[in-house]
Amino acid sequence: MGIAPRHMKTRTSTQNLRKRVRYHFRGNAAGSTLRLTLGCLLGLELRRVGSGGRMTFCAAGEARLSQWMAENAQVCWFEDPEPWTAESELIAQLDLPLNLDQNSHNGFHPQLKELRAQARQRARDLPVSH
């Protein structure tokens, strides 16, 4: 579950739903927690890239993840004038095992958090991928 725009008290968000969904489907794990989670669950190897500060599944892994998402992921949405409020309420009421933020009550939360932490640690232990 995600929202667009995000709640910003001092400025207007530059993100909209189309941009956020497009990035989840075409971006990489460094900028998408959804891609990071799905890639870890699929057993893709997370690696440090560039100067070593970002982590992705590299070109082949990101392509494989994009293909998996094209075949398996679905998107739905609803409009709300304050989506940040609706997000909190829905996460509290629904079983959304892939959401970590605001979702520590979910039974899968500790396992998913640990899986992602292990993937990040393995990536830190490997050389930077070029």
Residue ranges and their predicted role:
Residues M1:
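Short beta-strand-alpha-helix junction that forms the catalytic/metal-binding core
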Residues A4-H130:
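Boundary/linker segments flanking structured domains
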